Amino acid sequence: MFHILSPLRGVLKSSATSVRIDNTVFRLHYRVTVTGLVAASLLITARQYFGEPINCLEKEGIPPTVLDTYCWLHGTYSSEAAWRKAVGREVAYPGVDRGDRRGFEGEGQTSSSRTYHGYYQWVWAVLALQALFFYLPHYLWKSLEGGLTRNLTLDLGKAILKEEEKAEQLHLLTEYLHRAKRMGLHRRLPTGYLICELLNCLNVVLQAVAIDQVLGGRFLGYGLAVLQNSMSTSSSPSSWPMAYDPMLRVFPRVSKCEYFQFGSSGEVESLDTICLLPVNIFNEKVFLLLWYWLLMLAVLSVASLLYTLITAIILPAFRIALHRLTTYRGEGEKKVVDGQFCSTGFGIGDTFVLALLEKNLNPLHYHDLLICLEEEKECTAELCKEKVV
């Protein structure tokens, strides 16, 4: 199993050491969620771990492989009436009834009394497509950011740095930030980031709605129904029959298939067979975890969007004011760097860039950067060295 997921190992390893241009919630979308969806998609296609995705009972004169392939391509179905019957007395399995074959003259069950299951052959593709949509906001933000944070970090992300190199790099960084402030180079960055976070929120909601459509309108309440079923079963196992298991309603492990062929007289014959769907044992767990994950991700994404809106748009100086730094210059002289320069000299975009630098610079070097930026004038290399040593 691990050799199938080995390509994802390199992605996680490289992302752990990359420059951070967003927050933790944002990374949950394009790292954790994308990795999980791709892993699930790959595992579903790995038949050596789950066997054949469908196995149907043999019918006389029909090769088993033909019947399996036919039912896989055309889908299986469950009887709606069978879900309300007692398992073991009236039906052999939830959703599987006897004598429910449709007649050609309209007798018996109609198609409206059946629930057809054809989604299982598309589950891997749906998960892969979801992974793509979860990555798109990050791709958009990465394009808008354009590697700015990586370029500005220089070597200041290292803990140990020679004083001459440190002073020179602080000088270059300080000079750039002051020039960018005057030219307004960073004005659009906070808006772009906010739009990408909004896309994250919308994507979670749209993905849940899309899955609900694929699963026949049974996904939005899936996780809650499973939780209620588990609580009812644990409190009174005998009062909650297997027929009401919501996991079986959405992902049946046993269903029926109707096969048409020409008989010996030349008339069309309809044959019913029972099919096992081993792949649904995995599917039901994947979508249950996905339901709870999307719920958690939606809550965190909305909270992150509000935080970004407040700290980066409404109160741009508040983000740095949260991290007040007390520094000392000389003996007994106390100087408080509280980010007030951001509210007087730096705009929203500039404070946003400083917040990105805070995520990537060594705390000591970021501390010294704020000291240099405190001055209204641009710091020279000598002044930077004097202020930070």
Where are each of the predicted segments found?
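Membrane-embedded alpha-helical segments and the immediately adjacent membrane-proximal loops
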Residues: M1-V389
